[in-house]
From Swiss-Prot:
Keywords, sorted A to Z: Aminoacyl-tRNA synthetase, ATP-binding, Cytoplasm, Ligase, Mitochondrion, Nucleotide-binding, Protein biosynthesis
Catalytic activity: tRNA(Ile) + L-isoleucine + ATP = L-isoleucyl-tRNA(Ile) + AMP + diphosphate
Motif ('HIGH' region): 87-97
One GO process term, biological-process aspect: mitochondrial translation
UniProt GO cellular component terms: cytosol; mitochondrial matrix; mitochondrion
Entry's EC annotation: 6.1.1.5
Motif annotated as 'KMSKS' region, chain positions: 625-629
Binding site for ATP: K628
Name under which the protein is recorded: Isoleucine--tRNA ligase, mitochondrial
Lineage, broadest ranks: Eukaryota, Fungi, Dikarya, Ascomycota, Taphrinomycotina
GO molecular function, one term: tRNA binding
Organism the protein comes from: Schizosaccharomyces pombe (strain 972 / ATCC 24843)
């Protein structure tokens, strides 16, 4: 006969539930009588979540309603401010967005649990090339800047709405109605006022100098917008320039050629000089019919110079007196210039100088009155100024560069052409190679400001600590910040240019006037060319003696997002922002721009944030970085709806996505895939079942049933101390933002302590003792605190699961007074446990728990051996005998004597005695060393019957043990 009367126990916790009882019970009536006398778990909390139903019931209360409640009711003097690094308002969200936003939400919810009000206003970065490109493609015919801006704004607004809804699907709590977007007039005016402040401090300047230029974006880029390809292959050439009138020590040499190496042949039409190093030894070398000037040290490196004959030494101090010709530019002579940046480990020791195409070349040119020459257009094509128009229209990184080499070959200038693999800058948005091109651009001087910013970082906590060096490295490498962009979709730089001369007008008076006009008419009015909005309308009256036109350049998008600190209200005696949390790529981007704009604006070494948290990137299960080209990008929606789980029909909902995020060591790169999600799903299931066990066994209990700490059983006191220790550890981990370690501790605590130790040790009392007995209420007291502790610990990570548990508590619990665990806060969730544990000797009880664990481990070894030898089938068939000469150990064991059988999952434990007629069931473990002394442990066969009610082998011939007979007798009264 089969009988199963309970399904609410977690796996491994149903040893009381009778599956095959006919062998032991005389009748079905007996079975029913005994089963009905047990206090079995009862709960409506399901094993599997009803995702759709839970969303409908709980979602609003733990997101938008909760944020508004805390905003209105919690103390704003102790607020926690997290500034949202704005994602780009372009396209659908990917899993990296989920990682970022959910990490922020977990931290915000933890602060809320502590009773702090949270200020979190999500933001979006709305300007930039990708959106502008979409706007241009959407309308093939040529549009005005104003029309492009209108279309771009529509695209950005649409993306913001789509992304906002997806973030809300992730249960991210925030002030969504007050979100900031960098294209709003309010944000842009605040940004322009920061620009004005920097102008007042003489930090804004214009210069015609080489900048990184993206031909694919048709705009200048800042260092923060550049990525590097370590496998880029350039065409390198060894080539020659003929030296004029070469003589050394009165000896003349004819047809001497300077041997030069370059990886940018396309810059040869812009050559204005050659440079050499004053400390390098140079010589003249004859090879075949040519005489070359080059570094002595580098001759052996060149295969084509094998067998070359050294004719003479050429001291570096006389090289400056020489000139050379460029056969591509006849009838001109060019100088040799001394430079310390020339190296002696690669090339020839002589460097081709093009001040229009390299920063070092530019600086050398400034020292020697060489104006930068860069005959290129915005598309990276030669203009007619290059080689008398022979290269016009050709792309320098394509056919143009090839044609230059061809022309040089025709002039017998080329010695060798070869591919050269090296690190090369790319546009981080278009992923196309960049060039260095001299164009007039606007800059922020960082020579002093970066020192202030670096000093400000001294008071900032960096997570992980090694991220500090990365950020400092970027700051140290920025003498200025190129802030102008040649795009229509962006915040316009409020500069006017004199008509004809193009001399810029950028004064405090002019910029202030323009900003005031924009505040009234809107930023878009700058691009509106109507009769009532001509250029003259934007000119301050003091400057109307000349004719000016409005500039078309816009500000770098990093300047946009970098001024997002303007959305935060200052706080007394506190940093503006408690936390900024973004991906590791933001060391070169937002983290820098936020810090630099703020410290420059404040003119003091004070960072806007107190903590910077950097998370890594996401790879698939094979360790490949997720990218569209590889087809391995994960859509967060596929995690939420269960699509990514192989063979799993049941979606776990947003809690699965959130638990995966929490499980990641976010300070490093992390992995995601079906197998990983399946493991996370198992953890989530464990959290549900552990909570369900507590709920089921608290169905008949309320706070008035709580047992005073002094009356608790020994094992229950130990459990409370372990709970308190767990709370301390969890609190420390949340405070240090070690979220993945919170998950690890949760899983370990549920598995190693609650499920495998405590629950197993107390189930007999829960099910078989009298319902209102102190022994049973003692367990329930611990379960009550365990459940509230679990709710407290998991709420920031899986708020939906926590709310579902909260709503499943009996009506007499806290949920009748507080809508969510966050409303209750940790004061009501866990403080009462601390007051109980304060009455106990924590250190002493922790030590005693460790001794019990040592004993349990040794006994489990004996039980395992007995099972493997087939001497017993079930550990309840065994008795344990512990012998010792240590009075400390004996005293300790007697204090826990009533709990030991249940802790060890055996029917009886004897201390320093062996009843008659017991047979040894396993090999004895001699001299087990414990903290209280040495013990000998033996395992014996039980000599009593299996109790038909509790299954312990402690029964008489009538089928019930003494305890169960007593309980049944009292239940009949």
């Amino acid at each position: 006969m089969k009988f199963s009367y309970i399904s609410s126990l977690p796996k491994g916790h149903n040893h009381i539930c009778c599956k095959q009882a006919g062998r032991f019970l005389s009748s079905q009536a007996d079975l029913k009588k005994y089963s009905e006398s047990l206090c079995l778990p009862k709960t409506s909390f399901p094993i599997k979540p009803n995702v759709k139903g839970n969303n409908e019931k709980y979602f609003k209360s733990i997101t938008s309603d909760l944020y508004e409640w805390q905003k209105e009711n919690l103390n704003k003097e102790d607020s926690f401010v997290l500034l949202d690094g704005p994602p780009f308002a372009n396209g659908r969200l990917h899993i990296g967005h989920a990682l970022n936003k959910i990490l922020k939400d977990i931290i915000n919810r933890w602060q809320l649990l502590k009773g702090r009000s949270v200020h979190y206003v999500p933001g979006w970065d709305c300007h930039g090339l990708p959106i502008e490109s979409k706007a241009i493609k959407a309308n093939a015919e040529r549009k005005s800047s104003l029309e492009i801006r209108k279309i771009a704004k529509d695209f950005a607004n649409s993306a913001v709405q789509e992304q906002l809804m997806m973030f809300q699907r992730m249960a991210v709590m925030g002030d969504w109605p007050s979100r900031y977007i960098t294209m709003s007039d309010k944000f842009e005016i605040a940004e322009l006022k920061v620009f004005l402040s920097l102008l007042q401090k003489d930090l804004i300047f214009r210069q015609n100098k080489p900048v990184y230029w993206s031909s694919s974006s048709r705009s200048a880029l800042a260092e923060s917008e550049i990525e590097y390809d370590d496998n880029h292959v350039s065409t390198s050439i060894y080539f020659t320039f003929p030296v004029n009138s070469f003589s050394i020590d009165g000896c003349e040499y004819n047809n001497v050629k300077a041997l030069v190496w370059t990886t940018t042949p396309w810059t040869i039409p812009s050559n204005l000089a050659l440079s050499y190093h004053p400390e390098i030894n140079y010589g003249l070398y004859q090879h075949n019919n040519s005489i070359y000037l080059m570094s002595d040290n580098l001759v052996p490196n060149l295969d084509f110079m094998q067998g070359a004959k050294r004719l003479a030494s050429c001291p570096s101090d006389i090289i400056s007196s020489f000139t050379y010709e460029n056969p591509l530019l006849p009838k001109q002579s060019f100088p040799f210039l001394q430079s310390n940046y020339v190296t002696n480990d690669i090339g020839t020791g002589i460097v081709h100088v093009a001040p229009g195409h390299g920063m070092e070349d530019y600086l050398l040119g400034l020292e020697n009155n060489l104006r930068p020459f860069s005959p290129l257009d915005d598309y990276g094509r030669y203009t007619k100024e290059a080689l008398d128009g022979s290269l016009e229209g050709l792309e320098v990184l394509g056919d143009g560069g090839k044609k230059v080499i061809s022309i040089m070959k025709n002039q017998n200038m080329i010695v060798k052409v070869s591919p050269y693999k090296h690190r090369y800058p790319y546009d981080w948005r278009t992923h196309k190679p960049l060039i260095l091109r001299a164009t007039p651009q606007w800059f922020i001087s960082l020579e002093n400001e970066r020192k202030t910013a670096i000093k400000a970082l001294d008071s900032v906590k960096m997570i992980p600590p090694n991220s500090r060096a990365r950020l400092l490295g970027f700051l140290n490498g920025r003498p200025e910040w190129c802030i102008s962009r040649q795009r229509a979709w962006g915040l316009p730089i409020p500069v006017l240019y004199e008509k004809g001369t193009k001399i810029p007008l950028l004064t405090v008076k002019s910029v202030s006037y323009i900003i005031e006009k924009m505040e009234v008419e809107g930023v878009d009015s700058w691009f509106n060319d109507t009769e009532n909005n001509g250029h003259a309308q934007w000119v301050h009256p003091d400057y109307r003696n000349k004719e000016y036109i409005r500039g078309t350049e816009t500000l770098d998008v990093w300047f946009d997002s970098g001024t997002s600190w303007t959305t935060i209200a200052p706080r007394k005696n506190k940093p503006l922002i408690d936390l900024c949390l973004e991906g590791s790529d933001q060391h070169r981007g937002w983290f820098q721009s936020l810090l630099l704009t703020y410290t420059a604006y404040q003119s003091k070494p004070e960072a806007p944030f107190s903590t910077l948290f950097t998370h890594g990137f996401i790879f698939d299960e094979r360790g490949q970085k997720q990218s569209k080209s590889l087809g391995n990008v994960t859509d967060p929606e596929d995690v939420i709806n269960g699509k990514l789980l192989k063979g799993k029909k049941l979606p776990y909902g947003v809690d699965l996505l959130r638990l995966w995020v929490a499980s990641c060591d976010s300070t490093n790169d992390t992995n995601l895939g079906p197998n990983i999600l399946t493991q996370v799903g198992e953890s989530l299931k464990k959290w549900r079942l552990t909570s369900r066990f507590c709920l089921g066994n608290l169905h008949d209990w309320n706070t008035s049933s709580s047992v005073d700490v002094g009356e608790l059983r020994g094992i229950d006191k130990l459990a409370l101390v372990q709970l308190d220790k767990f709370q301390t550890e969890i609190r420390e981990l949340y405070e240090s933002y070690s979220i993945n370690k919170v998950v690890h501790h949760l899983n370990y605590f549920m598995n190693s302590f609650l499920s495998s130790t405590y629950f197993d040790a107390v189930k007999d009392r829960l099910y078989a003792d009298l319902p209102n007995s102190v022994s049973r209420r003692s367990v329930q007291t611990v379960l009550y605190h365990s459940l509230l502790t679990l709710i407290w610990a998991i709420s920031p990570i899986t708020p939906l699961l926590a709310q579902e548990i909260w709503q499943s508590l009996p009506d007499s619990y806290l949920n009748s007074s507080y809508q969510t665990p966050f409303h209750a806060g940790e004061t009501h969730l866990i403080s009462s446990l601390r007051s109980k544990v304060d009455l106990l000797d924590r250190k002493f009880l922790i030590k005693e728990y460790l001794v019990l664990q040592q004993l349990k481990y040794s006994i489990n070894l004996l039980i395992t051996a007995a099972r493997e030898n087939l001497t017993i089938k079930n550990s309840l068939e065994a008795y344990v005998v512990i012998k010792s000469k240590s009075q400390s150990l004996l005293s300790f064991l007697k204090n826990y004597s009533s709990d030991l059988p249940f802790l060890f999952n055996t029917s009886k434990v004897f201390i320093n005695e062996i009843p008659e007629n017991l047979k040894l069931a396993s090999v004895t473990q001699p001299e087990v060393q414990l903290d209280y002394g040495v013990a000998n442990i033996s395992l014996f066969f039980s000599n009593q019957q299996k109790c038909l009610r509790c299954w312990m082998h402690t029964a008489h011939e009538d089928g019930l043990c003494d305890r169960c007979e007593s309980v049944l007798a009292q239940l009949k009264r």
